[in-house]
Amino acid sequence: MERLCSDGFAFPHYYIKPYHLKRIHRAVLRGNLEKLKYLLLTYYDANKRDRKERTALHLACATGQPEMVHLLVSRRCELNLCDREDRTPLIKAVQLRQEACATLLLQNGADPNITDVFGRTALHYAVYNEDTSMIEKLLSHGTNIEECSKNEYQPLLLAVSRRKVKMVEFLLKKKANVNAIDYLGRSALILAVTLGEKDIVILLLQHNIDVFSRDVYGKLAEDYASEAENRVIFDLIYEYKRKRYEDLPINSNPVSPQKQRAEKATSDDKDSVSNIATEIKEGPISGTVSSQKQPAEKATSDEKDSVSNIATEIKEGQQSGTVSPQKQSAQKVIFKKKVSLLNIATRIMGGGKSGTVSSQKQPASKTASDKTDSALNTATEIKDGLQCGTVSSQKQQALKATTDEEGSVSNIATEIKDGEKSGTVSSQKKPALKATSDEKDSFSNITREKKDGEISRTVSSQKPPALKATSVKEDSVLNIAREKKDGEKSRTVSFEQPPGLKATRDEKDSLLNIARGKKDGEKTRRVSSHKQPSLKATSDKEDSVPNMATETKDEQISGTVSCQKQPALKATSDKKDSVSNIPTEIKDGQQSGTVSSQKQPAWKATSVKKDSVSNIATEIKDGQIRGTVSSQRRPALKTTGDEKDSVSNIAREIKDGEKSGTVSPQKQSAQKVIFKKKVSLLNIATRITGGGKSGTEYPENLRTLKATIENKDSVLNTATKMKEVQTSTPAEQDLEMASEGEQKRLEEYENNQPQVKNQIHSRDDLDDIIQSSQTVSEDGDSLCCNCKNVILLIDQHEMKCKDCVHLLKIKNTFCLWKRLIKLKDNHCEQLRVKIRKLKNKASVLQKRISEKEEIKSQLKHEILELEKELCSLRFAIQQEKKKRRNVEELHQKVREKLRITEEQYRIEADVTKPIKPALKSAEVELKTGGNNSNQVSETDEKEDLLHENRLMQDEIARLRLEKDTIKNQNLEKKYLKDFEIVKRKHEDLQKALKRNGETLAKTIACYSGQLAALTDENTTLRSKLEKQRESRQRLETEMQSYRCRLNAARCDHDQSHSSKRDQELAFQGTVDKCRHLQENLNSHVLILSLQLSKAESKSRVLKTELHYTGEALKEKALVFEHVQSELKQKQSQMKDIEKMYKSGYNTMEKCIEKQERFCQLKKQNMLLQQQLDDARNKADNQEKAILNIQARCDARVQNLQAECRKHRLLLEEDNKMLVNELNHSKEKECQYEKEKAEREVAVRQLQQKRDDVLNKGSATKALLDASSRHCTYLENGMQDSRKKLDQMRSQFQEIQDQLTATIRCTKEMEGDTQKLEVEHVMMRKIIKKQDDQIERLEKILQHSSLMLQVFES
């Protein structure tokens, strides 16, 4: 059971039982080469299989026997046979790491690219085992490094999913595909991001992996990183993208990552409009122009329209060419919706040499409106001179949407006018529109050929667009109009467009209009147009009526124009409208012209069917030359009904010229009401004749005109109905004008041809009906038209149809109608077969999913069991550790005891040295037999002691070795743990450093501007402070000068006092002079005092100013602090805004996920409807699954029984070992007892000796003490041995407990098998219920089919 539930990598070994094998297999398993040689010599089949479909080579490779493999290979054994798991011997050898066997097989030509049941090759298992040498050998022998099944990983993806970094690096070096994807569209980068493997992500980015690849759910690796909140990986991918954009060339003008991230914001709608118009005018020498545009847009809005129009006109150099006003008006009509356009026009004039111009633009715009339009208009006009010119334009557009509606319209209109020599024009357009839901591709290729006499010209136009959408609306229109001829030679233009597109929903509409023809000179040409639409759908019905016929004849030269078109449009939504109208009318004076107008509007009713009408009626005759119409025109010019219920194309026509365009929703609703009878009608009612000569019409043409005249009443009725239903819109007026104009033309033609009416016969009408039925049989919706034609003919001819000829013809028409019904039934049967196949595939996938779920549940159960086993193993390890600790403690005790004994022996030796002479004298005296006995006893004791010492030394050496090994193991474990801890710490520190560096860079970037502003303010303040300091220094210098003066004045004053004394002593008579001098001095002192007061006042003023400046500085510091607080508040506000932004972004993502879930629910509903028919298959499959489950259960029970037996055998062996150990311990105990008895005898002898030698000295007392100590040591050893015996007994009891536990597990497994049987019974009941439901559904389907038959009859 475990083997069946494995993932292919677990349980690689074969589960072998003897009754599975045959003789050759047994010989291989036993390794008996001689028997194998004998069997091979007796012509025994070397490729014989056992009951498990294994060959001898399989077993030899699985068991790793290269000699056996060499022998089998030399006997030409088949190397590529598979076992039950579809595994070859090579796969088995690689899986089990048998490199020698694998190399032998590879050297002898084994195929390494064969896959097993799981879709894996030998390379997958080598990658899983991380066997690099084996991988190199496989690759050298031609292994495909990308080989795998659809549902399996490639080797590189397997290495990534298993987190094998070394193997990823090795495979990348071996040039594995980095951009490989799995069945869910996930690349290696997406897998690595989901697993959170940073190293693998770095490796993949180093090897330039595609970062923009999306999986089935439309998600990028960056999206998964953001969902997982793995900041490191997200930053790595973001930096890689930024570097890629920086490394792009200058002309490419890449979109910056900020813009890309802004495009993913929470805006409801986005508009991306880019219009490029390039006009290149060339001279006599050719020029090359290439324009590329790659816009990338993403929107989460309600509607999104993408319009791309390319109009290229190549005009002659010397001849004049003009564009008709009708064409200009048709090009203007496409842009009736709300479109914002960005026009970029580059014009490059080429002189005498060729030039190359490349323009690339990648706009990304974002708006918050409800409806968005994305228009891409490119118009290139190239004028050629005398020589040939080559123009190539490429356009690549990638638009992504998860919205409700998408429209994609591409209009191509090219006109070619050639001069004297040939020219080649190639235009390519490659738009790619992507949606996050299910998407498909569509391609259309256009080729044209022109032949001119001896000179051949080729015009190739390719258009491979890939349109992908799962939204509600999708418009795809291709309009191509191109025909011009010159000279007197006939030319051929072939126009092909074979696109293949698929539709999986309700309806498809494809409208293609091709019309343009011109005549020159006195020549006419023949125009034959064919249209072959190929539409594929799994919807209810698809109708398409291709009818085009325009022919004109001339006298001298005839030309043919063939136009083939195979459009296929894919839709997965409710409504689709695709309208394109390019009418052209070219009228010349004396020359004849051909006008071809085609209109195929497609209106969709809420019912299942739809109608597709194409009307082409153009025939203009020349004035001077009489033209004829061949009889091949009959099937194209016909009518399909005269009743009032059938509606002509007048109710569906859209005005040509400036009034042509898309249809309004009001008109659509009105037309849905009118066209309830699901009629497809083809009317050709435009015939204009002119000129100077008389022309005659053959009856073939007149019959068709008669039929169209009879349809006049129905046409007028439909026009009046349209008036009543619709409101007054411009589309209504267009329909009324069209119906009135057609009515007038038909009445004029009827008045001019009265005789032709009377010549119409029933035979001709019946021929027309037969031919019309043949043409309409190409499409599936022409049956009701044939029925109505027959009824109308019977109503017209009334009683004239009673003759046998007419009745036979009517019967023939009915037979043809029945044949058509049979053809349609066959087509329906084919579709049913396809649907059944798809349902079978879906049931198989569901089986696989259920099996995988069962495997997952079993794996979880196994994981729990393994965890239990791990717990038990951990407990056993802990017990072993405890045992080792006990052993170490015993070892230490033994060593201590040995040390003590050695010390005692040394003491005894020291004591015995002085006693030796006394002993010698005693020995001389004691020459009796007692002396001999004493000598014998001493020699025996010495031998015993030596033997014990040797045993103890051996045990000590053994214990030391064990201790050293245990210590080394513990140290290694500690070092490994420490190394891992250091590694983790180092990684965490590196991560923290990176994060801190990133945060620092961000904070530096944020605060750099603020710091700059603050530094500016600080510089201004510092300049002011410096000025104030300078002024203060000046004041201080002045104060110092004043102080110097005061000091000088004081000195003068002192000197004056001294002089005064001297003068008083010297000159007593000069008192008057002294007084005078005193007065002078007083006056000077007053002056100086005044100056001092002034200086003090100035110093006070300066102090006040300093105080004021200090206060101003304090105020500025407060202002600075206030500014800092405001900055902090702003930062907090910014953080809050960022949080709000993140929350809004999360809500937007949730809305997108809800929309995706809604789409998925729709798809699931469709799948559930389809699964009703598969119920029977499921029932059968469930029965098979139940049988398989029973087989698996039996195998599981058998495996468990075998495992239990093995476990029992192992336990029995363990018990035997324990018993042997117990016996061994008992023997040791007996030996110890014997030794104890001998020692007791020796002690008694020593006691006797002690009594004899008490008089000789006190040395014997020390010997007795040593012997007593030795005895105590032996007793301790006995106790330790008893403890060991107790431990062994406890282990034996634990083993018995384990046996009982295994027995309980077997009983539980038996209970599980009973539960599975009960579930089997329940499943059978459920299958019976489902069978009843299937029978009810079949009855309902039969009833519905009968009702449908009744309605059809």
Swiss-Prot record:
Basic and acidic residues: compositionally biased ranges: 260-272, 295-306, 436-455, 471-491
Gene3D superfamilies: Ankyrin repeat-containing domain
Entry's Gene Ontology molecular function annotations: identical protein binding
ANK repeats, residue ranges: 19-48, 52-81, 85-114, 118-147, 151-180, 184-213
PROSITE patterns named among the record's database cross-references: ANK_REP_REGION, ANK_REPEAT
Coiled-coil ranges (or none): 731-762, 821-908, 937-1055, 1119-1344
Entry keyword annotation includes Transport: no
Region of interest (Disordered), ranges: 249-307, 349-607
Keywords associated with the record: ANK repeat, Coiled coil, Repeat
InterPro entries in the cross-refs: Ankyrin_repeat_domain, Ankyrin_rpt, Ankyrin_rpt-contain_sf, CC144C-like_CC_dom
Compositionally biased intervals (Polar residues): 250-259, 355-367, 389-400, 579-600
Superkingdom: Eukaryota
Keyword Manganese: no
Record-stated family: Belongs to the ANKRD36 family.
Name this polypeptide is given: Ankyrin repeat domain-containing protein 36B
Species of provenance: Homo sapiens (Human)
